[in-house]
């Protein structure tokens, strides 16, 4: 769902930063 998408985006951003 949307929550999973947000979690994935957060992980990607955390990896970049």
From Swiss-Prot:
<dbReference type="GO" id="GO:0005576">
    <property type="term" value="C:extracellular region"/>
</dbReference>
<dbReference type="GO" id="GO:0006952">
    <property type="term" value="P:defense response"/>
</dbReference>
<protein>
    <recommendedName>
        <fullName>Caerulein precursor fragment-related peptide R3</fullName>
    </recommendedName>
</protein>
<keyword id="KW-0878">Amphibian defense peptide</keyword>
<keyword id="KW-0027">Amidation</keyword>
<feature type="modified residue" description="Valine amide">
    <location>
        <position position="17"/>
    </location>
</feature>
<keyword id="KW-0964">Secreted</keyword>
């Amino acid at each position: 769902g949307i929550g999973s998408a947000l979690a994935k985006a957060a992980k990607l951003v955390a990896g970049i930063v």
